[in-house]
Amino acid sequence: NVTMETIQNRVAANRLAGNYTWVFLDEIYLFFKYYYSAQFLYKCWKRFRKYGAAMTGATQNVEECLRSDTARLMFANSEFLVLLNQAATDRAELARLLNISETQMGHVTGAEAGHGLLRIGGSIVPFANEFPRSGELYRLWSTTPGDK
């Protein structure tokens, strides 16, 4: 895939130039639909930090990711996860996979926007990221179409 090779080439070029790269993949579940892209992503997920890069994946619904053994390995081996509101089936799978208690999962059950759980290494912390809705920063950061 041209896109994946372009990402890899950019990370390599930035490393040579002494620049840090942050690769952000929205709708990451799409990478797990096909064997080649899933394997590529897994390789990058494990190696890019050695090349001065960080990988971030985002998806609305993790159920599609959790159907992939490769994605499950990536979730389980990630040192930093942000969990926002989750569907019931997703909560159950994530709780099992990540060893998160039912009480802790309560923070991603019917959670308001910007509320959830942070999993950092072996620690799990609830958070509420509330930001004033007025102002330019909110407008820039908001992913809600009506807020633009």
Task: Locate each region found by the language model.
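Conserved P-loop NTPase motor module
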Residues: 1-13, 17, 82, 110-148
